[in-house]
A protein has these predicted regions:
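Conserved FAD-binding catalytic core of PHBH/FMO-like flavoproteins
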Residues: 2-120
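A structural signal for well-ordered alpha-helical scaffolds and beta->alpha junctions
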Residues: 18, 22, 40, 62-63, ...
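A generic short alpha-helical patch detector that favors 3-5-residue windows
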Residues: 35, 71, 133, 158, ...
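Hydrophobic side chains within alpha-helical segments
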Residues: 44, 157, 164-165, 193, ...
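Hydrophobic/aromatic residues within well-ordered alpha-helical segments
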Residues: 73, 95, 99, 103, ...
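FAD/FMN-dependent oxidoreductases across multiple families
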Residues: 87-177
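C-terminal helical "tail/cap" subdomain of flavin- and related membrane-associated enzymes
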Residues: 168-259
Length: 259
């Protein structure tokens, strides 16, 4: 490991690579990735409100891409606004007043007027998946293993469930290659479902195919009026659609079987 001008040697029985989308560990392990470019950039910033947000999160689907606002402390919200790259560049370059006016037009007045906005950044949106997430003694988790579009806000939650499952596998099976094989089997369904859901939402809400607008509206109407469908979607989004790690259920780790 490089530390300034020095090189430090660290020995470990297991390396958990959680070093993000552009994982250097993945590069050093010479492992492949599958990349899908969504041809969108995400604008991120903190936005201040004039009235309380009530700890509610919001998402709007605009013609250019989804716009999400997540509650923070002191009546601030974290903004993630996906847009076409050229439009994102234009929005980032606006002064604060003009940016807030554009945001207000896109989002509406459900939260009242936006009062201020912090420094804005943008980054390209892409799906990055590792077909092989382990190479003993290394295991990849979170964005290093699977970077998703932020449309459903599930990337961070998915990474937490990776860690919860890995901790439980280590607790019950020790540090060995067979433990990592077991971990991969446990995580496969959850990762596949959330990846499919996220990618499907992007195609659904960005497609310009004839009749797709009607299909979107009917789908949202069904989701809003059929509790069983809404509950099923929420269950998968929370990680309860398959085998759920104990830590996700707030159960302390044990040495019993997890299968």
């Amino acid at each position: 490991v490089a530390h300034g001008d020095d090189m430090i040697s660290i020995q470990a029985q297991l390396i958990v690579a959680a070093d993000g989308t552009e994982s250097m560990t993945r590069h050093l392990c010479n492992l492949p990735v599958k990349i899908k470019d969504y041809a969108q950039d995400a604008i991120v910033a903190n936005v201040g409100l004039i009235k309380p947000h009530g700890n509610r999160a919001f998402e709007r689907f605009t013609p250019n891409g989804p716009l999400a606002l997540l509650p923070m402390m002191n009546d601030k919200m974290s903004l993630v606004w996906a847009s076409k790259p050229e439009e994102a560049k234009r929005l980032v370059m606006l002064n604060d007043g003009d940016f807030l006016r554009e945001l207000q037009t896109a989002f509406g007045y459900r939260l009242g007027r936006f009062g201020k906005v912090g420094k804005r950044y943008s980054y390209p949106l892409k799906q990055v998946l590792m077909p092989q997430q382990t190479k003993w003694p290394v295991v990849f988790v979170g964005n290093a293993a699977h970077t998703l579009h932020p449309v459903a806000g599930q990337g961070f939650n998915l990474g937490l469930r990776d860690i919860a499952a890995l901790a439980q596998c280590i607790s019950q099976k020790g540090l060995n290659p067979q433990m990592l094989e077991h971990y991969l089997k446990l995580r496969a369904h959850d990762q596949q479902m959330i990846t499919w859901l996220t990618d499907g939402l992007i195609h659904l809400f960005t497609s310009r195919l004839p009749g797709m607008g009607v299909a979107r509206n009917l789908g949202l109407l069904a989701l809003d009026n059929i509790p069983a469908l809404k509950n099923l979607l929420a269950r998968y989004a929370r990680g309860f659609g398959g085998i759920t790690p104990d830590l996700v259920c707030e159960i302390a780790l044990s040495t019993g079987e997890f299968q």
